[in-house]
Amino acid sequence: MKASRLSGLASRSMRKRAGLLGAVVGIAAVGVAAGVVAERTLVRRSKRALDDPYAAEDFGLLPYDEALTVTTADGTDLYVEIVEPIDGVELDAEFVAEVAGTMTTLEPTIVFVHGFCLDMGTFHFQRKELTRRGDYRMVFYDQPGHGRSGRLESGEYELPALGEALKSVLDETVPEGPIVLVGHSMGGMTMMAFAEQHPEYFGDRVVATVLISTSGGRLEETKFGLPALIAKAGSPLLPLVNSATRLSGGVIDRARHASSDLAWLLTRRYGFGDTKPSPALVSYVEEMNSRTSAETVARYLRTLYTHARYPALKALRSAPALVVVGDKDMITPVTHSEEILRHLPDAEFVKVPDSGHVVMLEHADEVNAILIAFLEKLTA
């Protein structure tokens, strides 16, 4: 009798849970259907903005003087573009002697390192303005698995390998002379991995560094603007990392392409700080995101999530450093840049108002002015 009663209670409990689950699923189905209609309407309205300053911008079509392929130690082919200076400037001789010692040339090369799910086009406006000025030799490359570069044959991507890939690019394209490294997001992390492996380059060849919207570690603590209930979890995205690395690219691709409109809205939400950014800019960033294969995305997640290289920043203390971040960055929040400053106490720090993670695109004029002023302090 007692067992029968317990069985009845369990049965009612199960029916109750099933009923609740059914209600949740039903509400979710209605919500999804309504959400799809709403998102498409919102995207159409957003893209029709008549005052978009970048509606006619030729993203991804900037000129270069040389294009080449650099092959890394693990056999990955990297696509590289080089822009030569028109007149060129030299670094201040006393500055170079103090920071790096004797150099065969005082003309610097600026090497740009882009972030996750992006490509060299991330630095579109910096490249455009510096090319117009004609003062600096510049090197741009697509990271492994991104843009026009090749993919790793097997296994997961690792930041130490990205650091070695950067070294391969430097050895091939800047065999001599001073180097200024500029890294955004994962590009900054790549620079840290490079510094961890080759600290001798800093204060010898690398005479200055620029870290934009990046982090030295503890990305697992980032809440990414998630609702408070989810964000209370110590590592809210850990299940995603563990699951994504086991999924096939096809599974993730189907999920990513289920709604390109949703992808556009998410890009605007997480990439930008302004509530009404340029639709053309949002589309450009979303296109770079979508060109990165789902397989590449999954194979990068673990190394980014476990990135911890604050000690590597010690190597960067030997030369001037600039740290830039948008005050509304939800991917690598301001606190991450502030932590970098604790390890680089002499670095310049600029927090750009009303800007998100792609600050160098969203507020290009401000970032260009900041970067050029920093570079001019190094020149004669």
What do the PLM-derived regions correspond to, one by one?
Residues 55-87:
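N-terminal cap/lid segment of alpha/beta-hydrolase-fold proteins
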Residues 137-190, 194-204, 369:
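Active-site loop/oxyanion-hole signature of alpha/beta-hydrolase fold enzymes
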Residues 2-5, 342-380:
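Catalytic active-site module of serine/aspartate enzymes centered on a nucleophile-bearing elbow/loop
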